[in-house]
Amino acid sequence: MKKTYIIVLCVIIVVIVSLIAVPLLLRPGRSEALQNAITKAIDYSEAIRDPYELLMLNVMYRRFGITAFADSLQLYDQELSERPDDAPLLRVFRRIADHDNQLQPGDLDEVSVDIDQITVPALYCDRLGFSDRYADILEQATFMGGNLLPHIVLARIWTKDNGCEWPRPESSMETVYSETADLIGYDPLVDDLRLEAAAFLFLAGQGSRVSDTFIDRVLAVQNDDGGWSYSSNISSESESHATVLALMLLLHVQNPADSYPPMLAPAS
């Protein structure tokens, strides 16, 4: 009886040691793969000039100290000056990188797309408050799901960064986080929507909802030029939006922390 007990105990110890040792053995390889992917993605992203992607690069500069993106706001302002038709909305979103950003009359009237109606009120909630309709907009967006869900997550981040009170019960965000994670699923496909869901969950401090399997898939489908395609099931060139999302995701995976600098630029 005693001999059997000792054998069982030894087996348990071996199993426990294996569970601890295997991740420790794998971690260096994972770390190297992460660093290589991030380095290539940064090199690719230095050539990005899409203004909205430049704002995300600015977040990476402030949050992770990626000096390659130190001039992202200056590049954004250059693009803004060269795109008069897009200038009103570009001025609106410029506040991501400049807390004291100044709007011109009529700029907010250009906010019409559904995802912008979710995010922009949060971006300016400390200045303008929330309209009486905003809680209903969030509720309807939660019901509709799809790509609206990650933008509710983004709005929650910006509301917190601005020190505003979330206009819906906090319990409602559990549904949003859960359903956003469900967008990623277990399909081997890596596409723009799944990258957006994963990146925004990490930005919101909900990265534990994103599986390691998905991270491995993201690493596996990176293109040779350092970017990511809109969808991994379509042979196509790298696309800036998908690449910026993937890079944001991988930087959070590489640099886990209990808290980060805010996504929105703080007051000067």
PLM region spans:
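Preference for long, amphipathic alpha-helical scaffolds in soluble/luminal domains
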Residues: T4-S268
